[in-house]
Amino acid sequence: MSVNGTDPTEMTSDDGVETIADELLDQALAERRALVQLCLYALDRASAGVVARIEEGLSSIGVVALRADGERFDPSQHEAAGTVPTDDKSLLGLVAETEVPGFCDRGRVLRAPIVTVYTAR
């Protein structure tokens, strides 16, 4: 209840303008996106222990790290940063290492992992 006795979540105008609750939700979502981006920025510059803690915290709100080690390289899902030559034909085209983890927010990719890929020597 607000001061004037109305429930702000039920307020709507005759012309279909967003309710106060819709505006607050939009603001909260925008602030969440900004905080997640700030966490990713900090994560890229942090020590291993801090990285683990930030990833744990992000995971608790649905933002998960993407590491592609051992997966088949897919340019639509991975960003190639380099290659690793190999004579092992079974490794060709696989991700050798994730250099920078990617992140996904409840199924929506925020950034692709940056990887190195095995190629023929």
Show where each model-derived region lies:
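Intrinsically disordered, low-complexity segments enriched in polar/charged residues with Gly/Pro
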Residues: 59, 87-91
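Charged, often glycine-rich, active-site loop that binds/positions anionic groups
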Residues: 76-86
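A hydrophobic membrane-anchoring alpha-helix module
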Residues: 90-121
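Charge-dense, E/K-rich amphipathic alpha-helical interfaces
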Residues: 2-78
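Long, compositionally biased regulatory regions of eukaryotic proteins
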Residues: 3, 86, 95-97
